[in-house]
Amino acid sequence: MIISGSGLPLDLPKQTAGSNIKLIPIVSSARALNIIYRKWKQNYNKVPDAVVVEGPMAGGHLGFSFNDVLNNTAPTLEQLVKEVVDFVDTVEETIPVIAAGGIFDGNDIAKFLKLGASGVQMATRFVCTTECDVHDDFKQAYITAKKEDITIIHSPVGLPGRVILNEFTKRVTKGETIPFRCPHHCLRSCNPRTAPYCIAKVLADASKGRLNNAFVFAGSNAYRCTEIVSVKTLINQLKEELSNSL
């Protein structure tokens, strides 16, 4: 299974031709899914096996304009899920819709299931589990964060990103640069000659707890995490909340 974000993966079926790999694009609009659907079907006789609809409350890089995210003028996840579900209902194939971005508890899960989603994608909650393999300092950034610490930055790749405010974030926001060589060439939109720092290195350092020169990506509800629990405990809690909300 490949879950593909950061742009429209119009040629992805070409890369997996002859395999049974499931292809699941991440989109931020029904229009994006419409384009992917038509191109895949026309060129490869293939449609998405499912689709993740990611809204503006997600952590990390976001598929919306900086101002829309900052000013809360981007479409809500509720609006996006409804639009995508409506589009999927017009095609002959069955394409499960998975809601993502800011989903925190079983009540949220129930809300999106009622809107027609087949499931949800959650990341922030699972950072604060014992099984998550990031450094403990990364997890503690979630536990100690306040609501006002969750902020939006301009990422070097040209997208807004949601992070937890720390000293490194303040420094680079004020214009500090960290020279680097670019071994990755991960995105064309990132120019290593003008980028203030390497986002790939920053994220790798964050996962290892080197937060003096890194920041932590996090969803809009990260500040609501208060403890580290096992995945089993979290799943049981979500199931109970979901059951009570349906």
Annotate the PLM regions.
Residues 57-77, 81-98, 104-246:
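Conserved active-site-proximal phosphate/metal-binding subdomains
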Residues 1-91:
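Active-site entrance/lid segments in N-terminal catalytic domains of soluble metabolic enzymes
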